[in-house]
């Protein structure tokens, strides 16, 4: 085979390989880039996970997840509300109020945000701001029994007893088995020295829920006339909730 033929064969093989390579698909690495819709969905799932962790008492983990959800989607008021709840669970009340503020900027007509804000202010003993928030929320959603109850408690603290009764009665009319509101009606009657009405309210609350609070309240109410029965009831209440031994705890329960 002469040199010319060998050169031609070599050129043919090179060209053929080049043509084959040109037909081979390139291997390009694939990166998943989520769109806005997918990001929103992921953030809501993370937020849901953060909310569920609160029920298991995993407050720090809940806070981390809630912050992650917000870092992905800061335009959802529900995620800000979840973050606020996680912050409250970690005693970060000022930060929680800022989160509620962010949520209200996104959706100022969401009543739950004002109710949550009111609850946070109550934890901070800021009665004035708590009342403003609760009243604003009730303008939007007037039949929220928990908000009515909390507003009644504020009036009770302020010794505006008739106003307190009105709020408790509104809540009870909506939710007849709302024993906490019935119990606090009894507290109002007790403060007004209407002992018979107070006893009736406490007994009604106990019939719905044998909680330590109305049992102890009943014990105090009947103490002057039925001392032995009062002692029995007081012991029963303290067995159910020993925290009532603490004067600070009783004060927190509006005693």
Question: What is the predicted function of each stretch?
Answer:
Residues 51, 85, 119, 153, ...:
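Residue-level recognition of tetratricopeptide repeat
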Residues 27-39, 231-255:
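Terminal, low-structured helical/coil segments at or just beyond the last alpha-helical repeat
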Residues 203-246:
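TPR/TPR-like (Sel1-like) alpha-helical repeat modules
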Residues 82, 116, 150, 184, ...:
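Canonical tetratricopeptide repeat
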Residues 2-73, 78:
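N-terminal leader/linker segments that initiate helical-solenoid repeat arrays
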Residues 55-64, 89-102, 123-136, 157-170, ...:
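Structural signature of tandem alpha-helical TPR/SEL1-like repeats
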Residues 72, 106, 140, 174, ...:
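Structural marker of alpha-solenoid helical repeat scaffolds
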Residues 42-43, 77-78, 111-112, 145-146, ...:
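Helix-start (N-cap) detector for alpha-helical repeat units in TPR-like alpha-solenoids
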